[in-house]
A protein has these predicted regions:
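Transmembrane helix-bundle core of multi-pass membrane transporters
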Residues: 34-37, 41-46, 125-184
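Structural signature of hydrophobic alpha-helical transmembrane segments
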Residues: 44-55, 93-104, 221-234, 281
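Short loop segments and helix-boundary regions at transmembrane helix junctions
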Residues: 63-146, 243-255, 272-275, 299-300
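Helix-loop-helix "hairpin" substructures at the membrane interface of multi-pass membrane proteins
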Residues: 163-239
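Transmembrane alpha-helical segments in multi-pass inner-membrane proteins
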Residues: 226, 230-281
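Cytosolic-side transmembrane-helix boundaries in multi-pass membrane proteins
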Residues: 277-307
Length: 307
């Protein structure tokens, strides 16, 4: 009863859909009941919109993250953001705003440390990763009235708490990322694959690296409500890996990965609604099955004789 339990905690009782035992959906109409309920329940519309928008942003940003081989960096930023979230929670401020500041500063700090050679990048990521989680847990526990549910909502996501302002912020970020991809796809692509070559072509690699690090941080923080800190890194990487199994073109991956992420998000949300399982886990499970299927199909094609 996970999905319905989350809803009854976050919306008024009369707004929640009727509490009844929902067994495994037995027919097509039951599966499609989710889409018909979108009209009746506003929070489902917000959840669906957030899934679509976060899928687009994570798909595009994930292409850069995977091709640049900075998945560990993205994981460090994700967990470091918990520090800002905990401090803001303790102060009574907006937790997402606190996480945003902490994540952006962490991303820029790691990028600066790596470029200056003052400290190894992997060491800096490991330090920020653990310190961020420790600071977040400490300050959240210091707030009066703290419960474990407050921590769980951010670690594993709580998609039914997505508000109109969250959707608006994701929409603005999506517009910025799409515009940036259309205008600067080639310079970003060169920077992701070979910074020395990009620098020889006159591309400002340092500026692009800092901007992309900040965008990675913003994308991660705005998607926390959907996936949670623990699972979010998979949404950034798995759609790219799925498409990369079929294509080696950066442009193709950048275009197809968001579509895969959106499809996985929506499918996971529908599964969560019908089977009463955590939305974040359902999304990752859906993407994992897709990845396994794609890998099996690609292996089968390689074994088929030509002609």
């Amino acid at each position: 009863m996970f999905f319905r339990h989350e809803i009854t905690k976050t919306v008024r009782k009369e707004e929640a859909f009727p509490i009844k035992k929902r067994k495994f959906a037995r027919n097509y109409k039951e599966y499609m009941g989710f889409f018909s309920d979108l009209i009746q329940y506003g929070y489902l519309s917000n959840a669906l919109a957030a899934c679509v928008l976060s899928g687009i942003t994570c798909g595009v940003i994930g292409t850069y993250v995977v091709c640049r081989r900075m998945v560990f960096l993205a994981g460090g930023i994700t967990h470091a953001s918990f520090g800002g979230l905990g401090i803001a929670f303790w102060m009574g401020a907006n937790p997402i705003a606190g996480a945003m500041i902490f994540a952006v500063l962490s991303a820029l700090g790691i990028e600066w440390a790596g470029s200056r050679g003052r400290i190894r990048e992997d060491s800096a990521i490991g330090i920020i990763w653990s310190v961020g989680m420790a600071v977040g847990a400490l300050f959240m526990s210091l707030r009066p009235g703290y419960t474990s549910g407050d921590l769980s909502a951010y670690l594993f996501g709580s998609i039914v708490t997505v508000t109109d302002s969250d959707v608006a912020a994701l929409a603005a970020l999506t517009a910025v990322i799409i515009a940036g991809a259309l205008l600067w796809l080639r310079p970003v692509m060169y920077t992701a694959f070979d910074r020395d070559f990009a620098r020889s072509r006159g591309i400002p690699t340092r500026v692009i690296s800092y901007l992309m690090a900040a965008l990675v941080a913003v994308t991660i923080v705005l998607s926390i409500r959907i996936m949670g800190i623990v699972l979010l890194i998979s949404l950034v990487t798995m759609p790219v890996v799925i498409v990369n199994s079929l294509s080696r073109s950066y442009r193709t991956i950048a275009l197809a990965a968001p579509l895969v992420a959106v499809a996985g998000n929506v499918a996971g949300l529908v599964v969560s609604y019908n089977f009463e399982v955590p939305p974040g886990a359902a999304i990752i499970f859906t993407l994992t099955l897709t990845l396994i299927l794609v890998k099996l199909l690609s292996l089968r094609q390689k074994r088929l004789p030509f002609g």
